[in-house]
Design a protein with these regions (language model features):
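Hydrophobic small-molecule pocket/channel-lining residues, especially in calycin-type beta-barrels
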Residues: 18-151
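Positively charged n-region of N-terminal signal peptides that target proteins for export
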Residues: 1-4
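N-terminal signal peptide c-region/cleavage motif recognized by signal peptidases
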Residues: 11-15
Length: 151
């Protein structure tokens, strides 16, 4: 009986993770900084289940190879997790919560980096991810909007 209960819990946890609409490979389409359209270099965000966490891996293609430049594996309950650069060095922390379905709130902190609040929203059809981030740099407020497409 205990084994069956453990199996059900594991199955439910796996199903809950798979049901997260953010799990996908997202390609950056365009971005705006403080309302002005900015040039967009190719960037890919892959979000995958990672045990009881989710792995967020940002990559840029170099010679047709996806080079991971930033990543973090975090629970969606606000637990602090490390943000790592391409070399695996910690460059900050992230806390992720899910205030409502298809909405993810991130608080990112790091030495020599501005604290940043990010809201990720998956569209109702599941094909678009919008990232809105706010920070203060050199005393000026910065609002970045990035739009990704599921591929």
């Amino acid at each position: 009986m205990k084994l069956f209960a453990a199996f059900l819990l594991l199955a439910f946890s796996s199903a809950a993770q798979a049901a997260q609409p953010i799990v996908a490979t997202w390609h950056l389409d365009h971005q705006e900084l403080n309302g002005e359209k900015k040039e967009t270099e190719e960037m890919i965000l892959r979000v995958t289940p990672d045990g009881d966490k989710f792995l967020f891996a940002f990559s840029v293609p170099i010679n047709n190879i996806a080079f991971v430049s930033l990543s973090y594996s975090a629970k969606l309950d606000g637990t602090e997790a490390d943000v790592k650069n391409a070399r695996g060095n910690k460059v900050g922390t992230v806390e992720i919560t899910v205030p409502s379905p298809s909405h993810y709130k991130l608080v990112m902190k790091g030495d020599n980096r501005p604290n940043t609040t990010v809201v990720l929203t998956v569209s109702p059809d599941g094909n678009t991810l919008t990232s809105q981030s706010d920070s203060t740099q050199a005393g000026k407020p910065m609002h970045l909007v990035q739009t990704f497409t599921r591929r």
